[in-house]
Amino acid sequence: LHLYYGKKAEGCMDYLLTYYDRGFSGNPYDAGTDRTYSMDSLPQELSCYGNGDFRSASLMLENGDGSMSCDMRYKNYTIRDGKYSLPGLPAVYADNDEAQTLEIVLEDPATGVEAMLLYGVLPELDIITRSVYVRNQSSEKIYVNKVMSAELDFLYGDYDLLTFYGRHAMERNLQRVPVAHGSQMIGSVRGTSSHQYNPMMILAEKDTTEDNGGCYAMSFVYSGNFQGEVLKDQYNQTRMLLGVQEECFRYPLEAGETFYAPEVILSYTDQGMNRLSQNLHSCIRHHICRGKYKTEVRPVLVNSWEAAYFDFTGETLYNLAKEAKSLGIDMLVLDDGWFGKRDDDNSGLGDWYVNEKKLGETLGGLVKRVNDLGVKFGIWIEPEMISEDSDLYR
């Protein structure tokens, strides 16, 4: 069960968890005659589909016999210094003295399938990371049909939901709406997180502003399909979920195989949205970004696209670089139109050879001339795209 997440507190918080006899809320067989223990009303760390919780669940498995029930029970836990990593996935990283990892192992006693809940705690940043992995310890093939990387259940509170919607050339528009009964969802099925919704959600108390008030953030460390959901149940309790998009998701796990879910960054503050942003910024800058530009100032660049679109020569680009240099700009990026027969956006994609006739010189010669000005040179390429009107397609 989930107990508390919020402002740092001293002492035992068990008093927050109260048990009620909720009429027609199912009770586990193990509870015997105790009708106050219901998965449909108690806050959880990993809610499961098919065990009596009729809210949206974090985990949905299809067992070897075709059944869809799942009942993860506590098995053991481990606390260690340092931050866990995720095979093949981006994740927050930290030195051993900057973070601790909590691993909680759950097991379905009927199937032997395990779920490990991973928590990375970075106390100096007010950051907790969450992830889940599912290990098939049964003897049969199973399918993971849904797995949310993070879940927060709130017994009390009246919240607003903040999300960021958008479209091409108008991304990341703030929307703030009250959390109402039922479900409110954001997500993407485009193969990327996309410009339609940012894979992030904020729950804020009603009076929260930029500088004051309590607010919780979930931010997905993943750029593929995603799903975020906030729901209020019949008891005015709120559940917040974020993870991989469940639509058309059906991941097979043979016996002994493991599925690792992408990571979610969580943060809480009682000092308003600005402090929440600072927490996330510090985490991303110092514990996600890598390479030389983690600490170095990135170069300022001028891009040829809005300056010239497809209409340029080597000389006009060189003149653009000279003007850029006079303004203290560090780099010229040659955008679309330098390759093949690419004079509009209906042809040439896929023919990745330099159009020297258009440039009036070799690309290498142009790069050298620009570099001699003390300006770096970058180039645009979109290798996943192809035009029907191209030599490659023909």
Regions found by a protein language model. Give the residues of each.
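Polysaccharide-binding surfaces and accessory modules of carbohydrate-active proteins
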Residues: 2-231, 247
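Short Pro-Gly-centered flexible turn/kink motifs
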Residues: 70-74, 251-270
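Terminal connector regions
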Residues: 122, 266-299
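Short loop/turn motifs at secondary-structure junctions
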Residues: 128, 143, 260, 327-328, ...
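Glycine-rich, histidine-containing beta strand-loop boundary motifs that form or position
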Residues: 132, 145-148, 263, 336, ...
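Short acidic, Pro/Gly- and aromatic-enriched capping/linker segments at domain boundaries
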Residues: 234-254
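Carboxylate/His-rich catalytic cores and anion/metal-binding grooves
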Residues: 259, 263-266, 270-271, 370-381
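Aromatic-lined carbohydrate-binding/catalytic grooves of carbohydrate-active enzymes
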Residues: 293-394
